[in-house]
Amino acid sequence: MKKKGIAVVGRMAEGTQLLDGQTVKTRILLEELCRCYPEHDFVCVDTYQYRKRTIPILLRTVRAFLQCEHIFVLLSRNGRKFFFPLLTGLNKFFHRRLYHDVIGGALPDEAAKSPALQKQLKRFEINWVEFAQMKESLGQLGITNVEVLPNFKRLNILREENLKDYDQEPFLFTMFSRVVKEKGMEEAARSIDAANRHFGNKRAELHIYGPIDPQYEEEFQRLLETYGHCVIYKGCIPQNKSVEALRSSFMLLFPSYYAGEGMPGTIIDAFSAGLPVIATDWHFNGELVQNGITGYCYDWQKPELLTQHIIYTVTHPSEVNAMRSACIKTAGRYTPEAAMKQICQRLN
């Protein structure tokens, strides 16, 4: 690749403690590009709170086109509406190589409703999506410049020889995500409580990690007050410390029905720590969690099934422990090395 600048357009939220999936994914890609191309200059267009910083961001975007040959774009729904016309418009004059690394799983549905978005997507050199099903859906709209690039993280994947069977009570279930209602916080708390009432004593406990959405904070506090006997909020942990925090848990719970869900990084964290996952079959979770191999998926419209899975796993811990090795092996698919090889082939 010629020695020329590389730009990344996306939410890095510099100077904040944001740990949502979009921000983490953008930061990770930037870090890995810097590792692969240390001799290149980088221009970062941080789209965090872009509506409050419109002029500086516009100037930064123009600078990216002036100085960089390769421009990576990572934007969610609202960001796409604002930036795509700007980026594709500027590129009519600059003719840069634009790469769209898709955030979340909502893009096919958005594109189906928007001919303008379809045209914009066709103007990128490539659109990287997280699942084969997303590629297929976009292909049906005539968008063929699409490749599958799974989400990835640089984590210290637990070695198989360090795996330990979990057999202590109460069995510790964990959630590790942004704390919003749609991630299934209430369903998880109710299910843990219902399982304990089924047993007649406390055999399951839920720990929740992650930043609390300000709009959900009061409701979440009421949830903790109601279920404080079996649900504990543990605060935030750095993204690169996730394996260390999760490895002492029994299983990860992921009862999400979040509209923009793509490939959840929290499931990669869990697999890296040797944790099987109980997840809804919402969006693409079924492509990630293999029933009976790396966890269990259940119908997201039947939350009572989560309670049943908790009861079953607590009474059959040997089945859960037998999945841990498969989780570690699966985590190996989501390392930066494999993903960056695919990305670098495009740049070179």
Give, region by region, the residue ranges found by the protein language model.
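Conserved donor-binding/catalytic core segment of Leloir-type glycosyltransferases
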Residues: 4-9, 164-183, 188-194, 206-207
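Glycosyltransferase donor-sugar binding loop
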Residues: 46, 205-218
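Acidic anion/phosphate-binding donor-loop and adjacent secondary structure
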Residues: 139-140, 148, 152-169
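Nucleotide-activated donor-binding/catalytic signature segment of Leloir-type glycosyltransferases, i.e.
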Residues: 218-237
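Acidic donor-binding loop of glycosyltransferase active sites
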Residues: 247-261, 275
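Short hydrophobic beta-strand element within catalytic cores of glycosyltransferases
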Residues: 253, 272, 276-279, 289
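Conserved acidic donor-binding segment of nucleotide-sugar-dependent glycosyltransferases
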Residues: 291-292, 296-303, 312-318
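A short, well-ordered alpha-helix in the C-terminal region of glycosyltransferases
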Residues: 305, 312, 319-333
